[in-house]
Amino acid sequence: MGDLWLLLLLPLSLAAFHGVKGCLECDPKFIEEVKSLLGKLVPPEVPGRTHMLERQMKEMIRLSFKVSHRDKMLRVLAVQKVVDLRTWLKIELDKLSKEKWKGVFILQGRLLDIRKNLDSKLEKLLKKFSEVACSEDCVVTEGPILDCWTCLRITSRCFRGEYCEEDDPKKAESREIGLFLILLAEGVILGGVLLLFHFCISHQRKMKAIRRSLKTYLEKKLEELMGIKDEKEKDFRGRE
């Protein structure tokens, strides 16, 4: 178990030291075989043949780099699965080499289909392997395992730690910060609601006080007017 922890929890400088790669790039012999098979697909007289073959070779091989670096859980795979995938690719290219030449654009379309299938197969294999290797009962995997990032073979069988998306200090810190920001936002919103409620209640009380004062004022004025009216009537009657 110790060598697995050492491999998966070392800083990324380890990967940089060995050269960050993909599952299909770890075997130089396989790369030469793919290069040879691609060379059989294009007649020598085709303009720009060398440049096109180099580009197709790069896209075909580096595809595994793109897939395995989408997620840390897509980093390792059983060596036998890698071998099976390489065999499948060589068979597909060999089949294509036996077909009649139909032009550059047709060939590029066929190679694109092969790359799409390769992408799908590789991602499914990596995901399936990670699900088995990171299961709760620590399922023991059979055969050697390849770290596609460093091209190193892993001897341990049970997978834990960062590879299985278990507690990562940086992720835990990010979650805590996110939770704090959420609570802070909720506190600000709640405070704003309470302040608005207090303002509305205070305003309502002030309006009631104003209405009472206005009512009292009007009642007094009305009484004064009624008193003046009564006095005038008495004065008028006295004159009669």
Swiss-Prot record:
Residues 1-22 form the signal peptide. Keywords: Cell membrane, Membrane, Signal, Transmembrane, Transmembrane helix. GO terms for cellular component: inner acrosomal membrane; plasma membrane. InterPro entries: IZUMO. It is a single-pass type I membrane protein. Its main location: membrane. The chain crosses the membrane at residues 177-197. GO terms for molecular function: protein homodimerization activity. Residues 198-240 are cytoplasmic. It holds the Pfam family IZUMO. The keyword tRNA-binding does not apply. Residues 23-176 are extracellular. It is found in: Cell membrane. GO terms for biological process: acrosome assembly. Belongs to the Izumo family. Monomer and homodimer. Izumo is the name of a Japanese shrine to marriage. This is Izumo sperm-egg fusion protein 3. The gene is IZUMO3.
